[in-house]
Amino acid sequence: MKKLSILMMLCLCVCLGYAQQVTLQEVATGAYRAEGIYGIKPMLDGEHYTQISRDGKKIVKYSFKTGQEVGTVFDVETARDCTLKRFDDYIMSPDETKILIQTETKPIYRRSFTAVYYIFNVRNNTIEPLSDGGPQQVPLFSPDGNQIAFVRDNNIYLVKLLFGNSESQVTKDGKFNHVLNGIPDWVYEEEFGFNRAFDFSADGTMLAYIR
C-alpha cells in the first residue's frame, strides 16, 4: 500500500510539472476562447451552405463535405440592373428562390438597425428595391415566400410579391418612443435579446405583432 501511494504521488508530480500555466492576461484577452465559424447559412438540401465573399460582392455557395466553393448565388456585378457596389448581409426566402439583399446598414441599438433592402430573384437574376419609402427594419418572408413584412418608422408594412410587389401599411399609429409596432423598445431588446416583435401564421394568412 505504501509503494502504491508513493507511485501515485510521483505520477501526480510529473503531471503537475507538465501542466500548462494559465495567466490572467491570457484569460482576459480570450486566448482560450472557443473557435467558431461565423456568417455561414445552411441550404435546404443539407449539403451546401452560403457565405458572403470577402469583398462583399457575392453570395458564394460551398459544399459542406469538401468545404470547396461550388457556385455563386448572387453577384452585384452580374445581376441584371444591379447598381450596388457591395452589400452587408442577406436573407434567403424559405424556398431559396428569392433573397433579400441588405445594404446601407445603420445601427440603432445593440441588435436593432435600419437598412435598405433589395429583392433578388434567383431564377431570373433580377434585383429591385423592397420599398421606395425609406429604410426598413427586420424584414421577414412569409412561410410561402410570397410576402414580406417589415417595420418602418415604428409601423408595420406588407409587400405582396405576387401582386407586383404592392405595398400596404398594416399599422398607422407608430410614434418614436411612444408607440412601437412590431419592434421592441431599448429595454426589451436588451433584456430579452430580440429585435423583431412580429411573425406570420404558418399558412401566411395572418400577422401577429406586439404593440
What is the role of each PLM region?
Residues 4-14:
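Sec-dependent N-terminal signal peptides
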Residues 8, 19-211:
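Beta-propeller folds
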